[in-house]
């Protein structure tokens, strides 16, 4: 049969044959019916909750499977991809031969052939000049729902002229029994082919593989065109001033970029081109563990009809226990971005960023709550992507655990990290943007820097007060730290002042500096990385 938008002949070109029916770009109402059919079993089945949202389970895969990620190594990718088996840096870009790719593609197309399929055409990227037109093909209704939530939904006029740049075939029900002979990690796979412009998924039901798969591809394609591709949140003020927030989990990225005085551009993935900053996505993928209306009202109220909950515990009466992490701590909800009130409309993009904020939660008690970065320090700290967590031990002693993630998103980088740093700084320098390192972590008192002080710091950055402040240079890290800021406790700005004995800060600072240097060594395999060593801490 032929359905508006795509024909069985087009699917046959991908290797999918004898399709019984094509459900093309289904409406939310149709998806609701499909997901709640009483005949569905296993992970295909959706459960209606009292919030109005559907809840689904993804089985043993409650997060991404980075060890099962592969990219075909060929003439296009050989000298461009940041490969896992080359250079000093560790990453997830494991090479795959064309022969094994063909085998995996055969498994997925065989799984999808003869089935009733959902085909969803979407955009990745809010800027029409640089967006990817992505076609998702799946046999599972809620997976179609997920991508409808997460990607940008084309208008009917745009669908009429839609020509896919990239195909994602999700064969979650199939696995690869020959994985051992082929030298792969397991029977599951998430594989990419830049020449064929295609992603294959097998064995894992986790929705985030589709979202982050396309992020990895944007991270390949855009920087090669001189466009920054960023794992960050972004917002815009009343004077059209744009700020972007980088930070790993637990640093306050979502909380601090959600500001009643500013409109949200997006919460996770953005590009920065000649026109300005733009969202890659048309939705949000928020963590829900321990979610409460008081702490996260925007997310809480976004969980309603058309939202899709993943791996939450649903009680017999349909209520959701957000505090129950028995399935996973990584419980999630996806929803279209318009479920949030204070957003940029109608297109999730704005002008050039003037403020770039790197968030870190330093559990070592060394870094100041805020500092201004030079251009080289901007690249150094962007490549370092540092945060740290406090981990309790059996005797109640707490030892900080450092985390370094290149560009605050190493898992999704397809090119060498220095390429992202270079493009970001070029974009910043072209418009005179300034970067700041903001520490939302701990200091010498053993207490975390208060959210009140951190919000006042962010306000001082956004309204320009910080640029008028006198600064001093913090030794070892060579950071320019303001001496006073409106609304900020002056006793915390110099981290040394939070210690009864300043020698204690010195000792911890030297230890952390060594960790920075050890981590940064992996970027010195390129001239660009080697040139930045001097912008790091001095041991």
UniProtKB/Swiss-Prot annotation:
NCBIfam families hit by this protein: pckA, PRK09344.1-1, PRK09344.1-2, PRK09344.1-3
Pathway: Carbohydrate biosynthesis; gluconeogenesis
GO cellular component term, pick one: cytosol
List of residues binding substrate: 64, 206, 212, 332
Organism: Yersinia pestis bv. Antiqua (strain Angola)
Cofactor(s) essential for the protein: Mn(2+)
Its job: Involved in the gluconeogenesis. Catalyzes the conversion of oxaloacetate (OAA) to phosphoenolpyruvate (PEP) through direct phosphoryl transfer between the nucleoside triphosphate and OAA.
List of residues binding ATP: 212, 231, 247-255, 296, 332, 448-449, 454
Record text on cofactor binding: Binds 1 Mn(2+) ion per subunit.
Localisation: Cytoplasm
Protein name, per record: Phosphoenolpyruvate carboxykinase (ATP)
Listed EC numbers: 4.1.1.49
């Amino acid at each position: 049969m032929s359905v508006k938008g795509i024909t069985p002949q087009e699917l046959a070109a991908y290797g999918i044959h004898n399709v019984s029916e094509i459900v093309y770009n289904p409406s939310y109402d149709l998806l609701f019916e499909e997901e709640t059919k009483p005949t569905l079993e296993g992970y295909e089945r959706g459960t209606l909750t009292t919030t109005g949202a559907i809840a689904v389970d993804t089985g043993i895969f409650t997060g991404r499977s980075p060890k099962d990620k592969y990219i075909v190594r060929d003439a296009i990718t050989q000298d461009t991809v940041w490969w896992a088996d080359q250079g000093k840096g560790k990453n997830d870009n494991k090479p795959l031969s064309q022969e094994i790719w063909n085998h995996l593609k055969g498994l997925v197309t065989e799984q999808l052939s003869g089935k009733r399929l959902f085909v969803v055409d979407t955009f990745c990227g809010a800027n029409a000049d640089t967006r990817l037109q992505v076609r998702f093909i799946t046999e599972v209704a809620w997976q179609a729902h997920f991508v409808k939530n997460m990607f940008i939904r084309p208008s009917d006029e745009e669908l009429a002229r839609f020509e896919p740049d990239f195909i994602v075939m999700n064969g979650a029900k199939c696995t690869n029994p020959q994985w051992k002979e082929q030298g792969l990690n397991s029977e599951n796979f998430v594989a990419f082919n830049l020449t064929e412009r295609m992603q294959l998924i097998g064995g894992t039901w986790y929705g985030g593989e589709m979202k982050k798969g396309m992020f990895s591809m944007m991270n390949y394609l855009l920087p090669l065109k001189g466009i920054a591709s960023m794992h960050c949140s972004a917002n815009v003020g009343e004077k059209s001033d744009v700020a972007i927030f980088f930070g790993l989990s637990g640093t306050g990225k979502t909380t601090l970029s959600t500001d009643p005085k500013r409109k949200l551009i997006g919460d996770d993935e953005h590009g920065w081109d000649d026109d300005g900053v733009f969202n890659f996505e048309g939705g949000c993928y928020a963590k829900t563990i321990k979610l409460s209306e008081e702490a996260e009202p925007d997310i809480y109220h976004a969980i309603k009809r058309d939202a899709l909950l993943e791996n939450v515990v649903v009680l017999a009466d349909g209520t959701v226990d957000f505090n129950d992490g028995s399935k996973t701590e990584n419980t999630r909800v996806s929803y279209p971005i318009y479920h949030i009130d204070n957003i940029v409309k109608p297109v999730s993009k704005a002008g050039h960023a003037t403020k770039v904020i790197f968030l870190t939660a330093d559990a070592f008690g060394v870094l100041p709550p805020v500092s201004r970065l030079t251009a080289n320090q901007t690249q150094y700290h962007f490549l370092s992507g540092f945060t740290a967590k406090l981990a309790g031990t059996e005797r109640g002693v707490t030892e900080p655990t450092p985390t370094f993630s290149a560009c605050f998103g190493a898992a999704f980088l397809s090119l060498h990290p220095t390429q992202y740093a270079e493009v970001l700084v070029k974009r910043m320098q072209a418009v005179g943007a300034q970067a700041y390192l903001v520490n939302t972590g701990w200091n010498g008192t053993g207490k975390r820097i208060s959210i009140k002080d951190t919000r006042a710091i962010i306000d001082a950055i956004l309204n320009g007060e910080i640029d008028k402040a006198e600064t001093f240079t913090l030794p070892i890290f060579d950071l320019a730290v303001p001496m006073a800021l409106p609304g900020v406790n002056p006793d915390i700005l110099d981290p040394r002042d939070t210690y009864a004995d300043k020698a204690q800060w010195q000792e911890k600072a030297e230890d952390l500096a060594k960790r920075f240097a050890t981590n940064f060594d992996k970027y010195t395999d390129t001239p660009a990385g080697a040139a930045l060593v001097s912008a790091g801490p001095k041991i």
